[in-house]
């Protein structure tokens, strides 16, 4: 019987993984012989917590099901999502770009893109926030005033979250010195003093290595003052405050609150239902084989996946899977249906909108304003219980 992947063996194996890596099973098992059984998943760069999680999952599914899975990596949001849209990849774990692509916002407000039929498949929770060195003198968000703050290259979603974190502390972009830097370059930037803070997953090989070299501190985003979060709905509607433990550099028993959201495994609406069902079933049934491979792998458990905030519809096959597993609710169905109708209206409007306004320098703002003025509000979800032991419920 195949053995579960250990975290140590996974990290050792990843040291030689290239940007486009074929992950073969770590043990004996059935093997696919037809190229149609190969899949490509796009995601973050090697060494990030997000990559580590997906490598463990892909390695396990390759070994257990025989379907070969390759990981394609990129350090930018567009670079992670473009392979999904152009057909190079069949699935993507690409950060909040899935939301902006669905909405056709920001970089996706272009002739090349526009609103895209993105669908959720698997939505593990995770915690992300701002980390500083303890010797920086920065103890709370308010202390970031006047400091060198990251502005991540080609990563609109994370920059919006970075703005929301400043707002939590009563600050705006004018209160900090922005430093343009890549997501992957932040750790070295913090070491050298290029930046005074970085935005990262609370776990991952790179961030843990940093914490082993320098005492670090996660800025807390907790408290009962709801006014501190009032800009989050507009800047990052997929986010909620969430408590976490066991983050890089944290002491035993220490906890903090930062941003909790899913970096989901996504696909397009056209992906075959039977394939998505097989994938969801494989993720659920083989969870025990990869759950201890990384600090966050446990969050891939079916009873922990996040169902809200819901800002992009689930794939039809995943809705059926959730129904069969008794986790789907009337509130989720109403929200999902409303998102599908929103998609229909956006796609119907888009060709004419772009033809009329594509040359306008303010086209991004105009598109957001058109949606605000013409699309119905999405219904709230009030009947979804907290995920089981997700380690991040506020």
Task: Specify the residue positions occupied by each region the protein language model found.
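Pocket-lining segment of extracytoplasmic ligand-binding domains
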Residues: 96-98, 105-109, 136, 174, ...
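C-terminal segment of N-terminal export signals and the immediately downstream linker at the start
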Residues: 25-38, 223-224
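Short, glycine-/small- and polar/acidic-enriched structural segments
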Residues: 32-168, 179, 218
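An extracytoplasmic/periplasmic, membrane-proximal ligand-sensing/linker region
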Residues: 202-218, 274, 284-394
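Sec-exported extracytoplasmic/periplasmic mature domains
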Residues: 59-66, 89, 167, 171, ...
């Amino acid at each position: 019987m195949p053995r579960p992947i250990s975290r140590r063996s996974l990290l050792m194996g990843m040291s030689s993984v290239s940007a486009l890596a074929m992950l073969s099973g770590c043990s004996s098992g059935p093997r696919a012989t037809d190229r149609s059984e190969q899949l490509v998943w796009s995601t973050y760069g090697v060494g990030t917590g997000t990559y580590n999680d997906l490598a463990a999952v892909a390695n396990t599914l390759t070994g257990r099901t025989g379907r070969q899975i390759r990981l394609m990596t990129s350090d930018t949001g567009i670079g992670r999502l473009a392979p999904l849209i152009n057909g190079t990849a069949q699935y993507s774990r690409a950060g909040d770009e899935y939301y902006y692509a669905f909405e056709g916002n920001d970089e996706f407000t272009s002739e090349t893109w526009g609103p895209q039929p993105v669908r959720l498949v698997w939505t593990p929770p995770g915690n992300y926030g701002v980390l500083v060195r303890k010797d920086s003198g920065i103890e709370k968000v308010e202390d970031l005033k006047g400091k060198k703050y990251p502005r991540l290259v080609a990563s609109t979603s994370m920059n919006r979250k970075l703005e929301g974190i400043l707002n939590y502390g009563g600050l705006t972009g004018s209160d900090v010195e922005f430093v343009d830097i890549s997501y992957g370059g932040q750790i070295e930037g913090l070491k050298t003093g290029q930046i005074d803070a970085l935005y990262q997953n609370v776990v991952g090989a790179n961030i843990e290595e940093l914490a082993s070299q320098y005492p670090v501190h996660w800025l807390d985003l907790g408290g009962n003052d709801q006014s501190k979060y009032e800009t989050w709905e507009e800047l990052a509607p997929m986010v909620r405050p969430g408590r976490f433990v066991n983050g890089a550099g944290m002491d035993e028993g220490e906890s903090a609150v930062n941003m909790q959201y899913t970096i989901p495994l996504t696909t397009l609406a056209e992906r075959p239902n039977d394939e998505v069902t097989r994938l969801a079933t494989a993720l659920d049934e083989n969870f025990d084989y990869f759950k201890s491979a990384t600090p966050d792998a446990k969050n891939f458990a079916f009873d922990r996946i996040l169902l809200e905030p819901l800002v992009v519809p689930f794939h039809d096959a995943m809705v059926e899977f959730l129904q069969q597993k008794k986790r789907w609710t009337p509130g989720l169905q109403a929200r999902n249906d409303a998102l599908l109708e929103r998609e229909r209206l956006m796609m119907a409007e888009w060709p004419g909108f772009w033809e009329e306004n594509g040359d306008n320098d303010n086209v991004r703002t105009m598109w957001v304003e058109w949606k605000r003025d013409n699309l119905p509000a999405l219904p709230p979800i009030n009947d979804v219980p907290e995920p089981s032991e997700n380690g991040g419920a506020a």
